[in-house]
């Protein structure tokens, strides 16, 4: 479970690193901030060895990040 959570965290970070926050509309910015919050909490849970919580938060962040990325115009 630890590996799965870490993989989701890393996957989310890969997705959001290419997002230009200056081009986000308000709703997209809110989603971006939610993703960052989920990531932060997932990392905290991982550090606390709360693996189920870490995975759940990381998975939510991952799904939301991919949804956000799909909503952006192609480069």
PLM features: residue spans?
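Short, charge-rich amphipathic alpha-helical segments embedded
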Residues: 26-38, 46-48, 52, 56-75
């Amino acid at each position: 479970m630890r590996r799965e959570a870490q993989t989701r965290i890393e996957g989310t970070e890969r997705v959001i690193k290419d997002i230009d926050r200056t081009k986000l509309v308000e709703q997209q910015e809110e989603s971006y901030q939610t993703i960052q919050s989920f990531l932060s909490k997932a990392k905290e849970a991982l550090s606390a060895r709360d693996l189920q919580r870490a995975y759940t938060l990381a998975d939510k962040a991952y799904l939301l990040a991919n949804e956000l990325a799909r909503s952006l115009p192609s480069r």
